[in-house]
């Protein structure tokens, strides 16, 4: 009886350590993202993509209107430092 309890306890501990490792790894990979305006006058897709990748190599670009119905601005989403 003690051996089965000891085995169950060992399996529970190993399982807990594995779960905590997976959760910690997922939390480590999630980063905070920051936004910066690369070009506030206009947003042409190729130009915006180029400017964003030059300024932030891991950045993703997006054209967002400055005001409803207004001109689009080039925004770059990148990992915060």
Swiss-Prot record:
GO terms for cellular component: extracellular region. Keywords: Antimicrobial, Disulfide bond, Fungicide, Plant defense, Secreted, Signal. Its main location: secreted. Pfam families: SLR1-BP. Belongs to the DEFL family. PANTHER family: DEFENSIN-LIKE PROTEIN 144-RELATED. This is Putative defensin-like protein 148. It comes from Arabidopsis thaliana (Mouse-ear cress).
């Amino acid at each position: 009886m003690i051996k089965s309890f000891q085995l169950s306890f060992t399996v529970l501990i190993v399982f807990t350590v594995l779960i905590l490792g997976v959760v910690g790894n997922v939390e480590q990979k999630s980063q905070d993202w920051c936004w910066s305006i690369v070009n506030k006058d206009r947003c042409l897709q190729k130009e915006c993509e180029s400017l964003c990748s030059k300024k932030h190599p891991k950045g993703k670009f997006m054209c967002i209107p400055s005001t409803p119905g207004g001109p689009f601005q080039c925004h770059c989403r990148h990992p915060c430092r």
